[in-house]
Curated annotation (Swiss-Prot):
Pathway: Pyrimidine metabolism; UMP biosynthesis via de novo pathway; orotate from (S)-dihydroorotate (NAD(+) route): step 1/1. It is an enzyme of class 1 (oxidoreductase). This is Dihydroorotate dehydrogenase B (NAD(+)), catalytic subunit. Keywords: Cytoplasm, Flavoprotein, FMN, NAD, Oxidoreductase, Pyrimidine biosynthesis. The active site is at C135 (nucleophile). Belongs to the dihydroorotate dehydrogenase family. Type 1 subfamily. Substrate binds at K48, N72, A73, I74, G75, L76, N132, N197, T198. One of its GO terms (biological process) is 'de novo' pyrimidine nucleobase biosynthetic process. Its main location: cytoplasm. The gene is pyrDB. NCBIfam families: PRK07259.1, pyrD_sub1_fam. It comes from the Bacteria. Heterotetramer of 2 PyrK and 2 PyrD type B subunits.
Amino acid sequence: MTENNRLSVKLPGLDLKNPIIPASGCFGFGEEYAKYYDLNKLGSIMVKATTLHPRFGNPTPRVAETASGMLNAIGLQNPGLEVIMAEKLPWLNENFPDLPIIANVAGSEEDDYVAVCAKIGDAPNVKVIELNISCPNVKHGGQAFGTDPDVAAALVKACKAVSKVPLYVKLSPNVTDIVPIAKAVEAAGADGLTMINTLMGVRFDLKTRKPVLANITGGLSGPAIKPVALKLIHQVAQVVDIPIIGMGGVESAQDVLEMYMAGASAVAVGTANFADPFVCPKIIEKLPEVMDQYGIDSLENLIQEVKNSKK
């Protein structure tokens, strides 16, 4: 078996040469990282969230360091669907034609999501939509779409009806029980899941006696959340039949294989990109060696082995 075949995985809409994907919000639209290495090396790219209209994000400060991680409250800053369709996605396709794009979609109400999902699949090389259901629903008192199984299912159904590409749903860990939500979005037609999104957290400045972030709360990411991600992925993998792209604290080839053991079929790398811009190609390069170390001949076989063990 060639090195390439060992790492390749097939998921709905995605034929990946390797399973490593920069996570949405940690890689922009690839422009900055393209100065460092050829993005065609990546399995895929989850681009920054797209909303119907431009978003300027939250007031600063909006990033804070934590032990083994970071808090962010960026607020989905992006130039909006029109600019992303006209400039950002075509640039990626022109410069990196072998890189499948996963478009992350966010909104404040169901109609916003539907409008973006109806169009973004037309952009060149967009193979999959990642639906960010952790956004507050302005029509339901600001409660996140992803915290209620019925609301999440209705959103998925509406977006699925207009989407031209497979739909993956990004699950929030900030819930009492993630399983009913995973089952609800699968029943509503989701083609895959991505998980986990950030955990909510806060930090205080001892001098000012106030929260460090202007938004007060932020999303916690980085190595600190990996055990939580593994636990939730493992839980969800027992009850759904659609593939999971695992994320949360991944920074090494060993972490990637742990995600597979939990039930993931591909892996996204987020916060680690800030500490080391080369982390994704380094993991891709190291993966075959670590697979050898643990007697893993291919990722597809590992996926099957994990699936068989849950029966």
